[in-house]
Every structure is written in C-alpha cells, then in structure tokens.
Amino acid sequence: MKLIAASLRRLSLAVLTVLLVVSSFAVFTPSASAETYTVKLGSDKGLLVFEPAKLTIKPGDTVEFLNNKVPPHNVVFDAALNPAKSADLAKSLSHKQLLMSPGQSTSTTFPADAPAGEYTFYCEPHRGAGMVGKITVAG
C-alpha cells in the first residue's frame, strides 16, 4: 500500500510540474500577433494633422508617433475621452515632451488589458488648429 501511495505522489508531482511549465509558457510568451503602427505628426505637405488621423489596433499593439513636419509636436491622450474615462490610463499612454526635430519619434504600447473603444489624442501646441486623432482599440 505504501508503494502505491508513493508512486501516486510522484506521479501527481510530475503532472503538476508539467502543468506549471506549460502554463508559464502561455503566460510569459509575448503575443505573436502584436503589431507596430506609425502615425506621422504633421502631414507630408506640412499640415497640422496626424496621419492617419484614425487608426484601429488591438490590445498589445504599439503605435510609433513620428515627428514629420512643422514641429514641435507631442502626443497627449484625453483623460475624458477614453473608454475607461481614466486619467491614469491617459497619462500612461501620453508623451507630453515636445519632439523638436523631424525624424524624432516616441511610441506607446497599449496594454494587453486596454479597454476596447475609442481613445482621443492631440498635440498640445496645435490642438486649437485641429491636430486631434483617434485610436480605436478593437475588442
């Protein structure tokens, strides 16, 4: 009887170890489907716009903001205009430091648990001129 109990314990331990190893791969493996998108800050013609002005992504995707024309620019996500209405989320996605030279860039990776919906962002120096964009996180 003791031999059977010892064998069952060893078998249980082996099964638990295998399950732990397999589940750790599922948890810690980065998403293979995560993509990077580029949004230009200023159009190629020098207009004060984001190109593209609207973008649809998935949670876990990265958006690179590339300073193109008519600097300075930055990227600020509106705290009131995101699905969670969260100032903390908006702050974590924003890049308030001004990009002064064409070719400079900054990037934002949307968290894997980012709420689905529309996120509005703008350039602080040029918001009044209509430099506003929207990113939709697909659910």
UniProtKB/Swiss-Prot annotation:
Alphabetically ordered keywords of this record: Copper, Electron transport, Membrane, Metal-binding, Signal, Thylakoid, Transport
UniProt-listed CDD domains: Plastocyanin (cd04219)
Endpoints of the signal sequence: 1-34
Membrane topology of the entry: Peripheral membrane protein
Binding site for Cu cation: H73, C123, H126, M131
Principal place of residence: membrane
Cofactor: Cu(2+)
Molecular function, one GO term: electron transfer activity
Gene3D superfamilies named among the record's database cross-references: Cupredoxins - blue copper proteins (2.60.40.420)
Any one Gene Ontology cellular component term annotated for this protein: plasma membrane-derived thylakoid membrane
Record bears the keyword Signal: yes
InterPro entries: BlueCu_1 (IPR000923), BlueCu_1_BS (IPR028871), Copper_blue_Plastocyanin (IPR001235), Cupredoxin (IPR008972), Plastocyanin (IPR002387), Plastocyanin_cyanobac (IPR023511)
SUPFAM superfamilies: Cupredoxins
Residue span, Plastocyanin-like domain: 35-139
Domain of life of the native organism: Bacteria
Family named by the database record: Belongs to the plastocyanin family.
HAMAP family assigned to the protein according to its UniProt record, in alphabetical order: Cytb6_f_plastocyanin
Function of the protein: Participates in electron transfer between P700 and the cytochrome b6-f complex in photosystem I.
Stated name of the protein: Plastocyanin
The species this protein was found in: Nostoc sp. (strain PCC 7120 / SAG 25.82 / UTEX 2576)
Upper taxonomic lineage: Bacteria, Bacillati, Cyanobacteriota, Cyanophyceae, Nostocales
